[in-house]
Amino acid sequence: DRPTKGSYKLDGKEVANLTDKELAYTRNKKIGFVFQSFNLLPRLSALDNVILPMIYGNVFKKERKERAVKMLESVGLGDRIDHMPAEMSGGQRQRVAIARALVNDPAIIMADEPTGNLDSHSTREVMEIFADLYKMGKTVILVTHETDVANYANRHVVLSDGHISKDFKGRLL
């Protein structure tokens, strides 16, 4: 979205100058979003939740199911594609949300407290997925208050009162 103050560029373009259509395209194709509360549509199966961004991205109907199934398999949910969100654990729902965020192959993944509602086992599974994405060359921007989750990162930017107070590489204490 457009900044309320300051400016930033994405792919060399000033974001404030993009049209609404260009912003929508950018959100759909270049950035994948993962939320703490999953934001899955409760009346859609795991498969249909993952297909949804491809509908908005004008992916051919024939290709949608194949890509969605592959993405769900890649996060370990190949056997849950027909399940509804209410039939899945929190960790499974978060992996569906990750599959949905990745299905259009974005270069950037933004995750807002993606493990905040998960148990420790599911947290490790989800963080391993993000670590693998980083190894594949994706940019992963993750917001967390959990030190053990933050320690998966190779760079840390700490915000205090809306300003950057620290920016460093390495592990947190």
Question: Which sequence ranges carry the predicted segments?
Answer:
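ABC family nucleotide-binding domain
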Residues: D1-L159
